[in-house]
A protein has these predicted regions:
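Positively charged n-region of N-terminal signal peptides that target proteins for export
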Residues: 1-4
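Short helix-onset patch at the extreme N-terminus, typifying the N->h transition
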Residues: 6-8, 59
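Hydrophobic h-region of N-terminal signal peptides that target proteins for export
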Residues: 9-18
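N-terminal catalytic scaffold of extracellular/periplasmic and nuclease hydrolases
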Residues: 19-182
Length: 182
């Protein structure tokens, strides 16, 4: 009986692992690197709050996000590198250096039938979250980025901050239909 139970549990576990993870979360500390994490952790320990929870996560990674046209990488190029695996120019979001659209890991997850959500503490049209759904040569094209958001087919978007499109949206048909929701 014990052997049969063990075999059944092993089969269920193998089945669960064969399907892949149920959820995948990608946390991006925009502009944050190892020295910032070390400093914050040391501060937290000395303050008496213990180590940072993010340092206890089972899996962590760092990535090198080099811009294709500058020694200093901006958020748009960095987000594109993380999301799409391709180096691009500063200010470009979700496109390669020639302006050709790239597709992010989030698009491939959606195509594979997964639910996809983008959540950010900054506006949802900011370069970092936009790197996962937008295709623009100018990170400042927040109206175009918001159109890409609507076309993405993703399941959830949530962002913070004041809507940077407010002044451009007034007079647009969708603004008249929705009105001020804030």
């Amino acid at each position: 009986m014990k052997k049969a139970l063990l075999v059944a549990l092993a089969a269920m576990a193998a089945s669960a692992f064969a399907e892949g993870p149920k959820y995948v979360f990608l946390f991006i500390g925009d502009g944050m690197s190892v020295p910032q994490r070390m400093t914050a952790d040391e501060f937290s320990v000395k303050k008496g709050d213990g180590h940072l929870a993010m340092n206890a996560m089972p899996f962590t990674a760092t990535t090198r996000t080099c811009s294709a046209d500058s020694l200093v990488t901006d958020s748009a190029a960095a987000a594109t590198a993380i999301a799409c695996g391709t180096k691009t120019k500063n200010h470009y979001v979700g496109v390669d250096s020639g302006g050709t659209p790239l597709y992010s890991s989030a698009f491939f997850a959606k195509k594979a039938g997964r639910k996809v959500g983008i959540i950010s503490t900054v506006t949802i049209t900011h370069a970092t979250p936009a790197g996962f759904y937008a295709h623009r040569i100018n990170r400042g094209d927040t109206y175009g980025i918001s159109l890409d958001l609507a076309d993405s087919g993703f399941d959830l978007f949530a962002g913070g901050g004041l809507d940077v499109n407010e002044k451009n949206a007034k007079g647009h048909k969708s603004y008249a239909e929705c009105g001020d929701i804030c």
